[in-house]
Structure formats: structure tokens, C-alpha cells
């Protein structure tokens, strides 16, 4: 047996020498199996027949239904290693069919149309919500302009300043009374900025406004005609001032203001819009903030339309539940009641002066000690006054007995 083995080895060495002489470098291959699962379904492929039937080296299984198996050439190996690896591979493949995972169908690529747009700019629902919020803001701004208007005007009587032209061409007065005539003779139409008068126009005397009539004061730039008592041309004034800081006032001859007009600039309208939006934000407060300020367990009194899009579970957290308010009551100390007794019935060693405090604490131990000291300090000799009193008492008794 050993001779046969040596003979086979010699043959192999001779074959290697012949191949080296011919100069044809042998090319060997490594087979790598990487069973990477892409789909849930796998197909069986008997690779033993395909590999043993002379599969070309460097062949790559690129079938659309098969993936995970690659055969590549990496470097040069000896014939012994190649033969051993091939034989082992054939034995392992003949043992049973090889499971090759089927390639999963690729998902459609995002890059065209609406999907690509949404991938860049977000969900369409969010875009719709944002556009709705913008439309709501603009609509609210227009409502502010409609409600407030482009000016604020006030009056104390029936005469009002109806309009100050935006271009500063005229100022229009109106008599809002339906049946009264109003005299505006010698009245003053003036414009003030920061409390200082910048222009002043005095009406002609004996000017009367009929009921529901208008009077217009034109500036020189309007090139209007002077037609009293309805139209007056102010030649000295090129244009009226229309800035937001300018107030147009109609005064009586004595200087009392009876009507005034203030234009509203678009910036002021935006400021009002900002304040209203900020107020709406404050009205929808987080639960922790309301709990801190008002000591409520949950918060919000108003829910905007944006909040209504949330599920009902989130909205239920914003229900108002007012907690009980507890008032801290201080404990009252009851007044001390003094005993209804005469101070002369007390201990003779306690002061009986009416201004002396009777509730002053007294230590009994010290009082007892004082009594003992006083008893010790008393003299042992008898009291003469008491002896005389007893003698006189006995004598009186004897005299009464004798008289009987």
C-alpha cells in the first residue's frame, strides 16, 4: 500500500513539473456559500451536477430567482488543495440538495412623482394642515381689517369725522342725526402729532350741516372747487397727513374736541393679529403650567382646530377638572377665664394688689421653702397681746357669772 501511495505522489509531482514546463499557470477556484436569506421562500438547487459537469471558473449565479451563492477565483492554490477541496465539495453536495434562498422582489424605488415629493417635504396631511393654518391666519387678518376697519373714529355728538383720505386729499365730516341740523361755524379742524398741532383749518361762520349730510374739506393737491356749504377748499394745505401717529380732531370754537379720527396702519393690524395669536396660545396651556398657576389637575378651556385632529384619548387629557380650594384656617387661642373669687381668699403670701397679674406662675416648691423659713424665724416667746386678751375675756366671763 505504501508503494502505491508513493507512486501516486510521484505521478502528481511529474504532472506538476510538466505543467510548469508548459508555462500554463493553473487557475483554481474557491467556492463560497453565503446563504443570506432575502425572502421567506427558498428554492432547491442540486449544485453537485452543475459543478461536476464543468462549470467555468469565476461563474456567478445571477439568476433573478437565486441569490446568496458566489463562485470566485482568489489567487493560486496547489493541486493537492484543489483536489481535496473539490472532492469534499462534491461529497457535501451529493449528500443532499442545497437550499438557495429565493430573492425577494424589490420594492418600487422612490424617486418619481408624489412619493418623491413627500419624501422631500413630508406627509401630505402635514402640508394640508400647514396650508390650512396659513389660510386661517390670512382669513383672520382680513376679519380684523373688516371689524376694526382702516381707522378708529369717535365723537361726542352727532357730527363725526367719516373719512380721512389715504392719499391726504380730503377730510369728510358727516351729520349722523336724521332730523337735526348742526352748526359748525367757526369750528376748527386740526391734525395733531404727539400732542402738537401741525395743521389747523377754521370753518367760515354761520355754516350749518343739514340732517344726514356731509361736508368735505379738500386739500390744495386735490384741485377741487370751493363750493360751500358742502365743499371747502383749503388752499394753504397741500395734503392732509395720514400717518398712524396723526390724529384728526374737530373742535368747537372754544377748543373742546367733539370728534376725532385715527387711521390704522397695516403694521398695527399685524400687531393685533400677533397679540390675538399669542392670546390663543396662552389659552391652550400645558397641564403642568395650569396646575402650577391655577392648581388644576388638567388644563385647557379652549381647543383649537389643530388640536381637534388629535385622537380622543389626547383630547380627554385636556378636560377641565377644577380642584378643591382649601383655605388655611389659623387656630384660635381661647381667652383665659379668671376665677370669680375675692383676692382676699387667696394665699396670704400671694400679692393681692388689683394691678398685680393673677395668672403669674408660682413655684410651689419655693413657696413652701419660704413658709418653712418664716416659721423658723418666728420667736419662741409668747405674744403678750394675746395673753392680755385672754385675761380680759376670762374676767368678763366671771363678772357675768356673778351677776347671774
Curated annotation (Swiss-Prot):
Chain positions covered by the region annotation Disordered: 1-23, 361-404
PROSITE patterns, per database record: LTD
InterPro entries on file: Lamin_tail_dom, Lamin_tail_dom_sf, LMNTD1
Polar residues: bias regions: 391-404
Keyword check for Magnesium: no
Domain of life: Eukaryota
UniProt biased composition (Basic and acidic residues): 1-22
UniProt similarity note: Belongs to the intermediate filament family.
Protein name in the entry: Lamin tail domain-containing protein 1
